[in-house]
C-alpha cells in the first residue's frame, strides 16, 4: 500500500516524513527525486534516501530537446530559474515537461519500492505492529509530493492520502525562515496552491502541524493508524 503525503507550502510535510522514516516507514520524496532527474547533486545522505536512489535518469537533455531551449548555466550545470521562467509562463511548455517527468517518477518510485529494504534503513520497525490481516510494513510506503493532487495527468500511485496542514501565519513564518523571502512572496505562492477544502474528498486523514516537534509524532501516529490497519506502539 502507498500513502500520498501532501499539503501546501510551509505545512511541514518534510517534518512529518522524517518522523515516518524514524518509525521505519519507507518514504519517497518526489521533489528530491526530480532534482536528481535534472542532475542536481543531492545535499545530504538523508536527501539521497528520501529520493529513493542516487541512480536517476538524466532527463534534462530530453526536456531541452522537447522545448528547444537550454536550461544550463555557463558551467553546464542545471539552471532551475531558467526552467521555472520558461514553464510557468507557458502552460504548453509545462505540460510537455510534466509528460516527461511524471512517467519517470512513476518508474523510479516502482523501482525503489522493489528495493525498499536496501534503500531505507529500518524498513522493519519496532514502532509498528501488524495485527492479523493488516498491511505488512514491507508493503507500505509514503510518496511525498506537494502537487500530485493538483495534476490530472499525475500517475495515481497511491491508495490513501494524508494531508499535512497548518495555520497560514505559521506557514508563512516557516517559509520566510527557510527561503529568506518576503511575506508577500510567500502569500503569492500559497494563493497558487489549492487549499485542503478543494481536495477534501480525496484525503483520508489530516495532520494539523501547529505543534512542537516533540508533540508532532503523536499526531503522525494517529493519522497513520487511522488510515491503514496497523497498530502503532506508543
Report the location of each language-model feature.
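Hydrophobic anchor at the beta1->P-loop junction of P-loop NTPases
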Residues: 5
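Walker A/P-loop
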Residues: 14
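Small-molecule kinase domains that catalyze NTP-dependent phosphoryl transfer to phosphate-bearing small molecules
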Residues: 109, 150-151, 155-156, 177-228, ...
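Short beta-strand-centered segment that lines the nucleotide-binding/catalytic pocket of NTP-utilizing
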Residues: 25-39
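ATP-binding Walker
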Residues: 11
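ATP-dependent small-molecule kinase phosphotransfer cores
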Residues: 36-120, 136-137
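ATP-dependent NMP and nucleoside kinases share a basic, alpha-helical "lid"
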Residues: 110-113, 136-174
